């Protein structure tokens, strides 16, 4: 009987982790930088193609390591230039990655989990339940796949991917270690060299991990707000029952202050017809956010089957935006992109092998975000 050796997947290793790996196989640490450039700058997954690495080391690497990204199931291109990749991860589920071109800017929307346990009522991902956390290699692998697809070299003036947003499937802060590792690779010059201001993590509000985030990484923060009061947010975003608005906004302010720079919080607000789109909601929002440096991104709801919600009229959207503008807020309305390939905000579904029944998901959220578990999870990043 033979046993196969589990190889180290180098794709998800940060620079310190890669250096430690080369230490472990008796090689000099500078080799880490050489290999990382081949992997992330040039999309190479074949050690034999790494021509500035000695043949002896290449043979050693082939025996103990690999470069393995998620499997690309499909790639679709929208009429507006938006691209969507469906990729299969180790759990067997599929997740989605979306690229949105806009002038000289190209934004990649990356998933952090297969499915999501938060069960936000207007999100198609949440309707599927939760299957698994993605590994660091599966998170950064989405950037790697997209970059290879464009044949683009990171950190060059004409690179395709200029911004990354952790706004795909899943709640990034409930996959803390792997998401933080992947974001470090996004910003590392040996990785993708993206500015910290151009890497954004979006959260529905896992308060203890927002506080933990500033200890480990400096990235832009976006809050999925979607309601201006606790009663409504409890219905739309169930985790609000555990971390209500006052607690949540205070944690966001602590995060922004900890960065030590003049930074603003991005507020994401999905507009739902006759639910949260009335002028009184805008007035409540003004009062809620009046002391918080922020910019507001209004997202007209993108319908999906059996959602139970509708997109507001253009007039209703404009009135809501104008009310916020008049109060002095910087407000934009997100243009729907990639709708013809189901790549618009809130439409990402993949093919998730659901491990949670719908009635159990809020319990799962409470367990996932229990303070003791979160503290242990944070400690593991050290």
Curated annotation (Swiss-Prot):
Residue ranges occupied by any Radical SAM core domain in the UniProt entry: 102-342
Residues given in the record as S-adenosyl-L-methionine binding sites: 170-171, 202, 224-226, 302
Positions with a binding annotation for [4Fe-4S] cluster: 116, 120, 123
Cofactors named for this entry: [4Fe-4S] cluster
Cofactor note: Binds 1 [4Fe-4S] cluster. The cluster is coordinated with 3 cysteines and an exchangeable S-adenosyl-L-methionine.
Keyword tRNA processing applies: yes
Pfam family membership, one: RlmN_N
GO BP annotations listed: rRNA base methylation; tRNA methylation
PANTHER family in the cross-refs: 23S RRNA METHYLTRANSFERASE, RADICAL SAM CORE DOMAIN-CONTAINING PROTEIN
NCBIfam families: rRNA_mod_RlmN
Protein name: Dual-specificity RNA methyltransferase RlmN
